[in-house]
Amino acid sequence: MGAPAPVLPPLATLGAGSAAAFAQKPVAPSLPSVGEELTLERGGKATVLAQEGDPGAAAFRVKTVERELLLRWRATPAPASRETLQRAAREGMPHGALLWPVDLATSSKAAGFGCLSPLPSPSFLPLASLLAGAPSPLRPRVTAALHLAEATLALHAAGWHLRGLSLKDVFFDPSGGEARLAGWDRILGIVEGTGSGELLAPEARGGQKVEGPYADLHALAVLQFCLIYQHFPFAGRKALGLPAGEAALDQLAASPVFLFDPARRENEAVPLAQDATGRAGGRAIALWESTLGDVKSLFSQAFGDGLRNPPGRPGASSWRLALGKLRDALYPCAHCTTDNVYDLVALKARGGAPGGCIHCGRELVLPARMKVGKHVLVLPAGSKIYRHHVEIGRSIGSDAVAEVSCHPQKPEILGIKNVSGQTWSIQWPDGKLLPLEPGKTIKLENGLKIQFGQQEGEVRR
């Protein structure tokens, strides 16, 4: 047996000098305090304004010279985590939708360090609230879904993954349609965790750690469906037997059956006439039936074979392409303003009849359209023409070159504004040629042609 551990004498038995020295070594606090000034690693100071979240949480709102930021404090960090965060802040955010580390901060009082990242604007809502809230305009939701696809592509290109996320980590602007993605500590692997069950891929359940893009693509597909249809993809008839809340979503995702899977009717969407609450997908039925075939095919693939075969899941680039087309096809009902989908295939099948609104059921009024190369764009007020429409070979994105708006005194008249920074040549239906300079607006008329440079667009009304 080894020698017994030495017993330290009580503080009172130590010599006066030793006792004073021992007592004068205060333990460093684990968190900074409100009002404290922190030192930023990349230069400058940040003042702690308030604590964020639950009492005791290591999250604070801080203010630098330029703006307010979110600070997450790590009192006992692993050495590698600091290097990872320094790299992330140095390289910058891979995509504007990511609430990404921008700097590190230290305290003269508290142990450890903190990481600063942007705060979502107050106009942004958590995606979780969208599922439980009132119907929201479709165009911003589709735009937010497109941004998430772009952000996922950028993350993968930078070597990161959507690890451990939940619906609470996703925010969107219900008016403009931008998306924000939090959870950088899990994306960067600083904090371990599988996230909440509603986004967890089937193969990652049971505590199994799954690396690579396939689990990301399952989470991305779930987020896309939640945004576009304002509903959880596995909440069909089975949801009626469960209490409302996050626990129900987790349970449904544990044994996922897509509510629009034609081969699995046990969890089919239930019409509102049979379930007025809409918990079983009733509000999503009309929009699903009118959605472009490309988008429906991706969801059917992701929540069909993709549930059993991870490599068979649609990639983020496929989502970006399909959602870009869906955004181009949206226009509001003239009666209730609900966004509907312009589907040329369905229009031809109806013999050119526009069909009824997915919300009010009244006959739709077809919007102005523009054919640009292979694209057919609908041009309601508020729509945009993007750079990828007019520049051959450019990837789908959100860089607008033209905006459509109503005449301020005559809302029935639409105009198209050049926001590209380049002068375009336009041709009126009578053949007259004129320049359209940046910042100028011209009336949308049937037969109007615009030479964008590489592509020509023609208006059809």
PLM feature spans:
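Activation of the activation-loop gatekeeper triad in protein kinase-fold domains
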Residues: 182-187
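Conserved activation segment of eukaryotic-like protein kinases, specifically the C-terminal portion
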Residues: 190-207
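Conserved catalytic-loop aspartate of Hanks-type protein kinases
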Residues: 216
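Conserved C-lobe activation region of Hanks-type protein kinase-like domains
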Residues: 224-296
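C-terminal boundary/linker segments immediately following FHA domains
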Residues: 427-461
